[in-house]
Every structure is written in C-alpha cells, then in structure tokens.
Amino acid sequence: MSENRHENEENRRDAAVAKVQNSGNAKVVVSVNTDQDQAQAQSQDGED
C-alpha cells in the first residue's frame, strides 16, 4: 500500500511539471513527447 501511495505522489508531481511545460510550449511538447523525454523529466525531478 505504501509503495502505491508513493508512486501516486510522484505521478502527481510529474503531471504538475508537465502542465507547466505544456502551458508555454504546448505544440512543441506534444510533437516531442516521447518516453525518453519523460525519463529525463523524472530523473531531474528525482535530483530535486
């Protein structure tokens, strides 16, 4: 249970970051939205 809760918190944070990025570069982000970009975003989020 605790693991799922932790995962949900991380997903919410990633979603919030994605919203901020999309607000400024919606068209660009959509065209470059790949698994690699998501992996980079998660790694940066983890360092913070």
From Swiss-Prot:
According to the record, the signal peptide region is none
Please name every pair of cysteines joined by a disulfide bond in this record: none
Q: Name one GO biological process term.
A: sporulation resulting in formation of a cellular spore
Where are the compositionally biased (Low complexity) regions? 35-48
**Record flagged with keyword Chaperone:** no
Keywords (alphabetical) are: Sporulation
What is the induction note for this entry? Answer: Expression is GerE and sigma K-dependent.
The UniProt record lists the keyword Electron transport: no
Region described as Disordered: 1-48
Biased composition, class Basic and acidic residues, residue ranges: 1-16
Name under which the protein is recorded: Small, acid-soluble spore protein G
What is the gene called?
Answer: sspG
